[in-house]
Regions:
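N-terminal small-domain helix-loop-helix segment of the aminotransferase-like
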Residues: 1-61, 68
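Short glycine-rich anion-binding loops that position phosphate/pyrophosphate groups of nucleotides
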Residues: 2-3, 63, 134-138
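Glycine/Thr-rich phosphate-binding loops of Rossmann-like dinucleotide-binding domains
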Residues: 6, 66, 90-91, 139-140
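Short acidic capping loops at alpha-helix termini that bridge into adjacent secondary structure
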Residues: 50-56, 76-79, 126
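Conserved PLP-anchoring active-site segment centered on the Schiff-base-forming lysine
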Residues: 72-94
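A short helix-loop-beta submotif of the ANL/AMP-binding
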Residues: 95-102
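Active-site phosphate-binding strand-loop segment of PLP-dependent enzymes
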Residues: 102, 106-176
């Protein structure tokens, strides 16, 4: 996304200092060890998980992350549950891999929460993965805790991999969680 505010000065300063320190060459395809360590630390502190830096993979953006996560697990003929509306890469990537995107609706009249009756009716023996974008792009809707808990139950019961796009998780307002 493209926020309507400038990059914070401390980020610009850190980039400038990094360039001046000679950090201009290729790094590990997994991301720098220091960055991976900080990401693991942040996830552990904010999401009550226990990741090691070795479990973190840094990509150049959501496009690469989408492709890598889907290419690693999908096979031709698999189905992927994808919210509608959604960023189009979640439709194009599985299609390019020979998998079939199957959409589930996020409707304004339902406060952009998942209609679980509809979702469960779309799960077949070919369903391998579900995509969750929270907060939603493009609606801005945020799933309630109840929605996320029920979604977790469905994913576990049906042995579905979950691709969770949380790129906008720190851009929530008005007391939303």
């Amino acid at each position: 996304g493209r926020p309507d505010f400038d990059t914070p000065k401390k980020i610009k300063d850190a980039a400038y200092e990094s360039l001046n320190a000679g950090h201009v060459f290729y790094t590990s395809n997994y991301g720098t060890p220091a960055l991976r360590k900080e990401i693991a630390k942040w996830e552990n502190e904010h999401h009550n998980v226990n990741y090691e830096a070795s479990e973190v993979l840094v990509t150049v953006g959501v496009g690469e992350a989408t492709y890598a996560s889907m290419a690693a697990f999908l096979e031709e003929g698999d189905e992927v549950l994808v919210p509608n509306p959604v960023w189009l890469n979640y439709i194009h990537v599985p299609s390019s891999l020979g998998a079939t995107p199957v959409t589930y609706s996020l409707k304004e009249e339902n406060d952009y929460q998942i209609d679980f009756e509809e979702l469960e009716s779309k799960i077949t023996e070919k369903t391998k993965m579900i995509v969750v974008v929270n907060p939603s792009n493009p609606t801005g809707g945020i799933f309630s805790r109840k929605t996320l808990e029920k979604l977790s139950e469905i994913a576990i019961r049906n042995d579905l991999l979950v691709v969770s796009d949380e790129i906008y998780s720190q851009l929530v307002y008005d007391g939303a969680e």
